[in-house]
Swiss-Prot record:
NCBIfam families: PRK00558.1-5 (NF001824), uvrC (TIGR00194)
Function: The UvrABC repair system catalyzes the recognition and processing of DNA lesions. UvrC both incises the 5' and 3' sides of the lesion. The N-terminal half is responsible for the 3' incision and the C-terminal half is responsible for the 5' incision.
Keywords: Cytoplasm, DNA damage, DNA excision, DNA repair, Excision nuclease, SOS response
Family indicated by similarity: Belongs to the UvrC family.
Organism lineage string: Bacteria, Pseudomonadati, Pseudomonadota, Alphaproteobacteria, Hyphomicrobiales
Organism of provenance: Rhodopseudomonas palustris (strain BisB18)
Low complexity bias spans: 1-51
Subcellular location: Cytoplasm
UVR domain sequence ranges: 280-315
Full protein name: UvrABC system protein C
An MF annotation (GO) of this entry: DNA binding
Residue segments, region Disordered: 1-59
Cross-referenced PANTHER family: UVRABC SYSTEM PROTEIN C, UVRC/OXIDOREDUCTASE
Listed GO CC annotations: cytoplasm; excinuclease repair complex
Primary localization class, coarse: cytoplasm
Amino acid sequence: MIQHPTDTPEVAADAAAEPERAAGAAGATPQPSQDAVEPAADVDAATASLAAEDDDEPVLPQVPEEAGDEVAAGPLAIGRSAIAQAVRLAPTSPGVYRMLNAASDVLYVGKAKNVKKRLASYARPTGHVVRISRMIAATVSVEIISTATETEALLLEANLIKQLRPRFNVLLRDDKSFPYILITGDHWAPQIIKHRGAQSRPGRYFGPFASVGSVNRTITALQRAFLMRSCTDAFFESRTRPCLLYQIKRCAGPCTGEIDFPGYTALVREATDFLSGRSRLVKQELAGEMEKASAELEFETAALYRDRLAALSAIQSQQGINPRTVEEADVFAIHQEGGYFCVEVFFFRTGQNWGNRAYFPRAEKTFTVEEVLAAFLAQFYDDKAPPKQILLSHRIEECELLAEALCIKSGHKVEILTPQRGEKKELVGHALTNAREALGRKLADTATQTRLLQGLVTTLKLPHTPKRIEVYDNSHIQGTNAVGAMIVAGPDGFIKNQYRKFNIRSEGITPGDDYGMMREVLERRFKRLLAPPPEAEAGKPKPDDEVPQWPDLVIIDGGRGQLNAVQEIFQALGLSTVTLMAVAKGPDRDAGRETLFMPDRLPIKLEPRDPVLYFIQRLRDEAHRFVIGSHRKLRKKDIREAGLQEIPGIGPSRKRALLHHFGTLKEIERASLGDLGKVPGISAESAKRIFDYFHPQPG
């Protein structure tokens, strides 16, 4: 954290010009994730522990340009007067202050050991950088919250910054909760599952992991190594025969007694030991068992131990760097380039590397890397448990204060270090290399996206470069499970946290009425935008205030007829500022032969290799991918609820034969056409009917 002008009188004049950064670590209770995930293609359909869940791609924030000219004297004088008024009533004790503009929007949240001195530094007529001057000029009032200690002020400050997202603070973005691996403790045969959110369920938690993908890969490998179950308790209790995971050697089958209680408990102990960092001991035990089985000529058993050892080696090879001297630490490295910042975070627990992730905090380019890193750390640990050590690439000010706040929050000692030698220094250097490369890739992608958007402006004769593009599509099978979807793109690429799906509700829509479905989706979307926000929501910050809510360009899948139908909807809603375009597939649905339709214009045909056409295809294909995925989730839900009841020509005897042969509905769904034909009593025609039911081609 930076030294503020009121803290040290000797450097008051110089420090007053320094940008004040917002920091803190808050003790807010972590909330369970509300992410909608599709159950993994596993035997137990309700098991979401290995769900194929997309991690949102982080995007570069929009960095406001620093004004080149001085701020007008009039607004500055008014702002200083408002701050001076607050100084008269401000306490000399620790606290948090909020600067507000004329609309009562919070411009800045800061904390101070002496609030009166800190505010007085803003009331001085000179010595401020342009960014601070602009903030002062916009200020009309100041709110103050007194705290008992400076540490408490630090915690409160970070919490308020995350809640209010003030314009002049450094803001942490893409702050989703991290996934953990949970070995449950409320059943005699524990599960191994993915977990996100509050750690309220009994059991052992291991993490955090940097991404859902790394957790899923690790759990799959752990199942091969330790044969632990991932199914729900309800599925476990309903089994009368082992499921497919037992057959493919990813579960020991405790549900049907294929392994006894002591044997399964030993597997759980081995898995717990491995995740706790005792991997060498576990591998030695497995190697010993393999040699013993081989010596006794039990080659099948020896092969099982060999496969389990290979699975453990696969996990460790995925982890890459596994330090010798660092047991539990988070490593942070920051890099600045082109006016943007990237913070790379590595997680090390029990001496193992559990992944890394890049963040792109929003901060004006006049901030130093030390200021951004300090603000980032405070907000990062606002709702996350800190490890015993935090290793940094750059020394931050008020390091001891942040460490004290994290100690209070976590209940254990927390060290914040900037290592200068040894293995810790190497880990920080590796993280710094990753930060540099991640920011370089992101800047290159953003530059490419900018060129494509400029090409779109030229080709479509748009009035300005679009900041928000919305693409719509719908999917159904003969009108059933109808769903519409909207994807969003902007200067930084796809904005996945803005994607939305719309379950079609209208009863009057006939099967296959694509126009009617699109009408419902667009009416619901734009009526919501046109409606005034509820009073309770009016003053709240948007989830991502850098993404405009109104689109500059709307793209739909279809031809002139679809375009005309959407035009009617827009006219009825009074929309005239949104540009509309329809993309019609070429003959035989060939990519590269699309035709673009826009209101009051002739059809547009682009060359197959035109980068703008490729960009439009990407937008359309992403909408199609998202809507098909949403449709499949709905259909899978219906299939689970209806079972085999809806398949025409499949009576009770054939249903019994199918369930007896495959064991579960999920295995029937996964079966190939040839596998279905092998079931006694199932003809080739019936097998095709069953296969087509589970594998339809959506419209």
